[in-house]
Amino acid sequence: WFTDVKEAVAIGNKEKKPLMLFFTGSDWCGWCIRLQKEVLKTPEFAKWAKENVVLVELDYPRKQYQSEEIRRQNAELQQAFGVQGYPTVFFAKGVTKNGKTNFEGLGSTGYVAGGPSAWLAVANGFLAQKKK
């Protein structure tokens, strides 16, 4: 998982993969923790992610330390994507021009009941649009 969005965009462009931006409150958000446990930390998800996306974790912890740079980056991205609740997962392509990064959104989701297969079915729907 990347925490630096600029680095993730560069990798995504190089590998021709969209970003999966995971907006989470890792140390306080119950649904975020469930999504991690039930989907994001499973072998099925790991295999799928390696083939399809570049993973970016944008964390908004209450107790855990974050550098000022990461905190600022995450706040800007939360605003840019209009995230109002956690967990939120955005699929997007990032394009950097003249030092500025713009995102082309492919879709968003959050917690989906039913484990990895149910969650990945939703994710694959967004990625299928990318190929059109």
Model-found features: residue ranges?
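Thiol-based oxidoreductase modules, predominantly thioredoxin-like and allied folds used
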Residues: 1-2, 24, 38, 45-72
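Active-site-proximal beta-strand/loop segments in catalytic clefts of secreted hydrolases
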Residues: 23-26, 58-61, 92-94, 109
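Short pre-active-site segment immediately N-terminal to redox-active cysteine/selenocysteine motifs
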Residues: 16, 24-28, 85
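A short beta-strand-turn-helix
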Residues: 1-19, 49
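Non-catalytic, surface beta->alpha helical segment in thiol-disulfide oxidoreductase systems
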Residues: 38-40, 76-131
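Conserved redox-active cysteine motifs that mediate thiol-disulfide chemistry
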Residues: 24-40
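Extracytoplasmic/secreted cell-surface and envelope-processing proteins
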Residues: 29-32, 65-66, 98-101
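Hydrophobic beta-strand anchors of alpha/beta hydrolase catalytic cores
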Residues: 20-21, 55, 89
